[in-house]
């Protein structure tokens, strides 16, 4: 059976596959068996292995499940990576898209997060090529078109305020009032407020670097509008905005 270049898996299928290869925890993969009793797990796992065999993704002829080569490479990259990137991207003309990108020295694998037929979380695995090839695809996905640079110093507000502002958890006028009270130019603050209220594209970009399961996390947010791009990054107890 020919294996498609994009492999769709349910959360349970992805979880079982990582167990077959003896993988450690995969960033972005939620535990779909949470709440399942220990004595029920062998039956649940056997059922999922049967599904995977019917899809041609594993072979159980010798009683031990073995992944097909391409899928084995994907799962090993996802489960043994030192660097994982989590992206959420939304635009005015489309819904939110979410994915996790797993890096190895020779291959990068993307897992798009989708909704399965039953409404449960599903993962669509796809190779992005080498790290350099993958980076170009990531930048294209973010659609950061050239915009005029602003000749102003970065703005700053309390940590977490910007995400609350974007999600309307923070009163619409409160961040604006705060920034003006800090002495930032009204023209710059007004431009940022307009961007927050009507962005062309908004993305969150979080990198997890995990040697020995001790993760270092760095995140930025990217906001694109007609005349400018804005970059937001947590610095200490502040959101820094360029």
Predicted regions: what they are:
Residues 12-16, 47, 70, 133-137, ...:
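Exposed alpha-helical structural elements
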Residues 20, 74, 137-141, 195:
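Residues that form generic nucleotide/phosphate-binding pockets
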Residues 45, 55, 59-108, 112-135:
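Accessory beta->alpha helical hairpin/"wing" motif in late/C-terminal subdomains of nucleic-acid enzymes
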Residues 113-182:
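Surface-exposed beta-loop interaction hotspot
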Residues 197-242:
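Extended, charged low-complexity segments
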Residues 55, 64-73, 164-205:
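A short-motif feature that recognizes glycine-rich, charge-decorated loops
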Residues 6-7, 99-102, 222-223:
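A general structural signal for short secondary-structure junctions and capping/turn motifs
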Residues 1-53, 57-76:
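Short, amphipathic alpha-helical interface elements at domain boundaries
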């Amino acid at each position: 059976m020919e294996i498609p270049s994009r492999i769709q898996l349910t959360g349970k299928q992805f979880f079982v596959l990582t167990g077959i290869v003896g993988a450690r925890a995969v960033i972005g993969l939620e535990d779909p068996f949470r709440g399942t009793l220990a004595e029920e797990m062998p039956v649940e796992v056997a059922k999922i292995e049967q599904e995977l065999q019917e899809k041609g993704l594993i072979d159980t002829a010798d009683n031990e499940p073995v992944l097909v080569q391409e899928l084995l490479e994907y799962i090993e990259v996802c489960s043994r990576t030192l660097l994982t990137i989590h992206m959420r991207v939304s635009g005015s003309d489309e819904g939110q898209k979410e994915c996790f990108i797993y890096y190895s020295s020779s291959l990068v694998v993307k897992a798009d997060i989708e909704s399965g037929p039953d409404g449960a979380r599903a993962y669509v695995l796809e190779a992005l090529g080498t790290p350099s090839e993958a980076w170009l695809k990531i930048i294209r996905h973010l659609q950061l078109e050239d915009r005029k640079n602003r000749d102003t110093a970065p703005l700053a507000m309390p940590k977490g305020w910007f995400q609350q502002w974007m999600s309307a958890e923070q009163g619409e006028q409160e961040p604006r009032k705060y920034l003006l009270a800090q002495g930032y130019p009204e023209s710059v603050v007004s431009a940022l407020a307009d961007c927050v209220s009507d962005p062309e594209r908004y993305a969150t970009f979080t990198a997890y670097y995990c040697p020995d399961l001790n993760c270092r996390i760095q995140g930025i947010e990217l906001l694109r509008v007609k005349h400018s791009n804005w970059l937001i990054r947590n610095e200490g107890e502040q959101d820094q905005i360029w």
